């Protein structure tokens, strides 16, 4: 991985997993097909600013919306995405793919920032702790 010097990734994992109902979040993987999401009205990831989680960008030059944790209430709920998946609606995999790609783009940006700041070891430790917490 990155700690060993790998600096480029080319993989279908984010899109394939999204189409099959597995979504990546800061706190672990979320399986949208799980019945517990049927009535869950929070976004996939409350810290995420992608279109699926946070809705439309704020402002004309914004590239992302406002996360749930930052007070935003746009985006789509886990319950709605669960419903889209269960009924085979094409919007479901489109939104989940947007989310997974945003997650990976943001993760790589955070890693580059940590490397530039000489804080990759701290970033890596926090990343592992967050993922171990669970969704």
Each predicted region: which residue ranges?
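Alpha/beta catalytic cores of nucleotide-metabolism and tRNA/nucleoside-modifying enzymes
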Residues: 2-135
């Amino acid at each position: 991985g990155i700690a060993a010097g790998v600096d480029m990734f080319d993989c279908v994992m984010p899109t394939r997993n999204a189409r099959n109902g597995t979504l990546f979040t800061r706190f672990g993987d979320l399986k949208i097909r799980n019945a517990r999401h049927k009535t869950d009205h929070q976004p996939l990831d409350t810290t995420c600013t992608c279109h699926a989680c946070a809705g439309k960008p704020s402002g004309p030059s914004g590239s992302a919306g406002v996360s749930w944790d930052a007070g935003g209430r746009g985006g789509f709920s886990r319950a709605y995405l669960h419903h889209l998946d269960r009924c085979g609606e094409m919007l479901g995999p489109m939104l989940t793919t947007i989310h997974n790609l945003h997650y990976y783009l943001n993760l790589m940006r955070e890693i580059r920032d940590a490397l530039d700041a000489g804080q990759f070891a701290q970033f890596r430790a926090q990343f592992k702790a967050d993922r171990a917490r669970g969704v």
